[in-house]
């Protein structure tokens, strides 16, 4: 059987690969018949600014994160123009806090505050009625809520009103430090609870739960140091980074179920004279881990220390790269690219940082949290 030869249209010149090496201008060439030399200018601009169609370049650059977008803009003037045109700055998170001038936490009256537009949305959550509620952690627009009476742990999404209950936490678990890796609607969600064991806290108890499981799984690990109590924890690069009250750092790997105490000395933020008057937080930005506080009391200027895992050291950032940190007990979110006056600033969960109020929220610090609004946030 004869096969028909298939023909293809000629490839457009703009899609063909050419050498990106700059060719030196040739001052002269020799003619084929050995005649006199003739001057000829030879210029090759390469692929960067001419060989990639604009719409394709914009599509590629629009898929990059902010840091990668900035790096790509350094290639040439054309890439700079297109990178800036599609650059996506991270939006400010929203603050969730009790509405004190009404019933407040006693009646389940809460507020969602959008700092970008100075808008407040008044909401009522019967499941948050009472004072014995703690917002243990916040991530991807979800809250992990702990109620002391009755003894309940559940997820709550203030933007949609969704609620997901978890199994009862095992006995002898204090639930003082709970956190999770991703939204409970994600298959990668993992919830962990830390409880120090024994009189001198030489052993740490880690309880884990994943969506679909009916019970918690309990692990016991040697803390290797006495007197360590975990009070800050974030999830980054597939690991839970756990910070103790004395500034010691440990890592829990949920996939391997391992616990390691890192040989990293506490940073300067954990000096006694700083900790007595200023809160210390831990946050994450594009895979980097930071310990942050303010430079002075009643001052929002950011003091940041970046974790260097290769050198096992916290490096103080003299200029914190224009980052803005929104801090609360439940979570601390980091943003880049905000207006100049908001860079290198640490905002607390006190509404007075944004608008003047006769009912500051610091009275309910464990009932307030910063939240990342969903992309399809049509209800607000």
UniProtKB/Swiss-Prot annotation:
Recorded superkingdom: Eukaryota
PANTHER family linked to this entry: TRANSMEMBRANE PROTEIN
InterPro entries in the record: F-box-like_dom_sf (IPR036047), F-box_dom (IPR001810), Gal_Oxase/kelch_b-propeller (IPR011043), KIB1-4_b-propeller (IPR005174)
Kelch repeats: 190-233, 234-279
Residue stretches making up the F-box domain: 47-94
SUPFAM superfamilies linked: F-box domain, Galactose oxidase, central domain
Family matches, as Pfam families: Beta-prop_KIB1-4 (PF03478), F-box (PF00646)
Hydrolase listed as a keyword: no
The protein, known as: F-box/kelch-repeat protein At3g18720
Organism: Arabidopsis thaliana
Keyword annotations: Kelch repeat, Repeat
Coiled coil (residue ranges): none
């Amino acid at each position: 059987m004869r096969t028909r030869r298939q023909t293809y249209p000629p490839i457009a010149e703009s899609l063909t690969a050419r050498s990106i090496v700059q060719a030196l201008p040739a001052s002269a060439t020799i003619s084929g018949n050995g005649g006199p030399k003739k001057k000829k200018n030879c210029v090759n601009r390469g692929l960067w600014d001419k060989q990639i169609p604009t719409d394709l370049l914009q599509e590629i650059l629009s898929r990059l994160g902010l840091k990668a977008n900035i790096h790509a803009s350094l290639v040439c003037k054309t890439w700079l123009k297109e990178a800036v045109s599609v650059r996506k700055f991270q939006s400010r998170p929203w603050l969730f806090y009790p509405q004190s001038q009404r019933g407040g936490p006693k009646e389940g009256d809460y507020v969602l505050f959008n700092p970008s537009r100075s808008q407040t949305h008044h909401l009522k959550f019967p499941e948050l009625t009472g004072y014995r509620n703690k917002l243990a952690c916040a991530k991807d627009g979800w809250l992990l809520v702990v109620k002391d009476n009755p003894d309940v742990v559940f997820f709550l999404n203030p933007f949609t009103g969704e609620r997901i209950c978890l199994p009862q936490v095992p006995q002898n678990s204090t639930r003082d430090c709970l956190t999770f890796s991703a939204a409970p609607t994600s298959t990668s969600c993992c919830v962990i609870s830390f409880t120090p064991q024994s009189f001198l806290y030489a052993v740490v108890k880690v309880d884990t739960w994943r969506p679909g499981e009916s019970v918690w799984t309990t692990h016991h690990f040697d803390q290797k140091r006495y007197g360590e109590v975990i009070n800050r924890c974030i999830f980054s690069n597939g690991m839970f980074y756990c910070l103790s009250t004395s500034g010691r750092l440990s890592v829990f790997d949920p996939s391997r179920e391992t616990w390691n105490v890192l040989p990293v000395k506490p940073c300067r933020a954990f000096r006694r004279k700083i900790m007595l008057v200023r809160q210390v937080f831990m946050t994450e930005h594009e895979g980097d881990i930071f310990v942050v506080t303010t430079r002075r009391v009643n001052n929002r200027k950011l003091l940041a220390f970046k974790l260097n895992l290769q050198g096992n050291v916290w490096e103080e950032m003299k200029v914190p790269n224009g980052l803005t940190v929104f801090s609360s007990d439940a979570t601390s979110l980091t943003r880049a690219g905000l207006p100049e006056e908001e860079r290198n600033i640490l905002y607390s969960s006190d509404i007075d940082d944004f608008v003047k109020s006769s009912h500051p929220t610091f009275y309910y610090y464990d009932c307030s949290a910063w939240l990342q609004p969903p992309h399809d946030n049509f209800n607000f």
